A protein has these predicted regions:
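Acidic, Mg2+-coordinating active-site environments of NTP-dependent enzymes
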Residues: 2-34, 45-176
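N-terminal basic/disordered segments at the start of proteins
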Residues: 40-42
């Protein structure tokens, strides 16, 4: 409580294509309220402030246009404590380089805040090493496949961006 006002816990937002696996995983990992937004909803704005915004990657391949994903990143970056963004594409790297509050994740770029290394599918389990600047831990996720790697990485990055320790987040992810 601050004075006679209750302190409001701001939610986390996931910008994607609707009912996303990333949002489901992030809810279960953190117990936070997670608001799902389409890129159009994110770009239209609003008054909400978020603890973190996780922007899923579904980039267009036309360099002449700003993708819906990029428009959402830019629109929400002023209304969040931190934007969680993949840096495996040029647009994500450009955004991360020009924004002060970015938590980056990648499938293999070790300079990201969270990187997946040694990714493999073994016995119907997605296994990868999660590398941060301070930690390295093996992550195991049942029934994984390559496209789902980004959902799990985005949720893990979102959890880390709001302060959950990597070891705790990886352990919880393994139980989902």
């Amino acid at each position: 409580m601050i004075g006679n006002r209750r302190q409001v816990e701001y939610p986390v937002a996931v910008v994607g294509r609707g009912d996303t696996l990333t949002a489901q995983l992030l809810r279960r990992l953190t117990g936070c309220s997670v608001e799902e937004l389409t890129p159009c909803q994110a770009a239209m704005g609003g008054a909400a402030h978020y603890r973190a915004v996780v922007v899923e990657n579904f980039e267009t391949h036309d360099p002449r246009t700003l993708s819906p994903c990029a428009a959402a990143r830019w629109a929400l970056s002023a209304r969040t404590d931190v934007t969680v963004a993949a840096v495996d594409d040029e647009e994500g790297r450009r955004f991360a380089a020009s924004s002060p509050a970015v938590f980056s994740y990648s499938d293999g770029l070790p300079q990201a805040d969270l990187a997946a290394e040694h990714v493999r599918l073994k016995d119907n389990t997605l296994v990868f090493d999660a590398l941060t600047r301070d930690d390295l831990i093996r992550v195991r996720v049942a029934l994984g496949d390559r496209p789902r790697l980004y959902d799990h990485l985005a949720a893990l990055a979102g959890a880390l961006a709001i302060g959950m320790p990597l070891e705790q987040a990886a352990a919880r992810l393994a139980l989902i």
